[in-house]
């Protein structure tokens, strides 16, 4: 197995500040709801020896990478190969968590090493399932079977892609001739109809985002998990959520607003964003927003 870790922990300094604000620093439970390769976990466990980690990761391939990467801390870690919403529905721990971290970004390993078609930069099968055994439909299934109307709605609703209508029409026309099987095929279909003069990012970016969100049921999992995260948070515990696009950030923002200020306190009025230096070192961090609250 290649042990190179692709992922850089986003907003790590801000997360460490949250941990340092915990009133008690002894035998605390830290749940990483989206363990990935373990980049956040490694940095946190190295710095704070009073934390024990519960690491949740649905993708068995990346979970094995995390176990190797975090081997030095194996005595302080319990792993769960599960979706985070399933874990919290059936919360298996005897005590509530003192710190819950949720990084909703897709690991760079999925883009660069998984061969599952998350990125249009490589020519790969158009799959995008984090776990093939629990996700019944692939991205290829969606683009080859959904109606033009359903494709247009999916692409717009899950990415705010303004050219969703022409993209969905192009997909439907192309598949009359040939089934779309790979990332490069789909990218070529999108590029052919996208006005490049209007493109601030790669024309395929938002469509790929929408497909990934749909395949893995990301927004529904987030909505299901929000009340479960705070339910399983100990008194004075902190929930920290990192989002990477406006749709999921709005869901988190609205949920935090709905909570009683007598029971929960937002750590900051506005989301915490990466510094210029962090963005310079780690370009994917540029869209990250951290929202956090404390259970009173």
Swiss-Prot record:
PANTHER family assigned to the protein according to its UniProt record, in alphabetical order: 12S RRNA N4-METHYLCYTIDINE METHYLTRANSFERASE, S-ADENOSYL-METHYLTRANSFERASE MRAW
The keyword Nucleotide-binding belongs to this UniProt entry's keyword annotation: no
Catalytic activity: cytidine(1402) in 16S rRNA + S-adenosyl-L-methionine = N(4)-methylcytidine(1402) in 16S rRNA + S-adenosyl-L-homocysteine + H(+)
Cited NCBIfam families: 16S rRNA (cytosine(1402)-N(4))-methyltransferase RsmH
Annotated function: Specifically methylates the N4 position of cytidine in position 1402 (C1402) of 16S rRNA.
Main location: cytoplasm
Family of the protein in this entry: Belongs to the methyltransferase superfamily. RsmH family.
Enzyme Commission designation: 2.1.1.199
One GO-annotated biological process of the protein: rRNA base methylation
Name recorded for this polypeptide: Ribosomal RNA small subunit methyltransferase H
Pfam family, one: Methyltransf_5
InterPro entries found in the cross-reference section: RsmH, SAM-dep_MeTrfase_MraW_recog, SAM-dependent_MTases_sf
CC terms in the record's Gene Ontology section: cytoplasm
UniProt KW keywords: Cytoplasm, Methyltransferase, rRNA processing, S-adenosyl-L-methionine, Transferase
Residues annotated as binding S-adenosyl-L-methionine: 38-40, 57, 80, 103, 110
Subcellular location: Cytoplasm
Domain of life: Bacteria
GO MF: rRNA (cytosine-N4-)-methyltransferase activity
Top-level EC class: transferase
Keyword S-adenosyl-L-methionine attributed: yes
Signal peptide: none
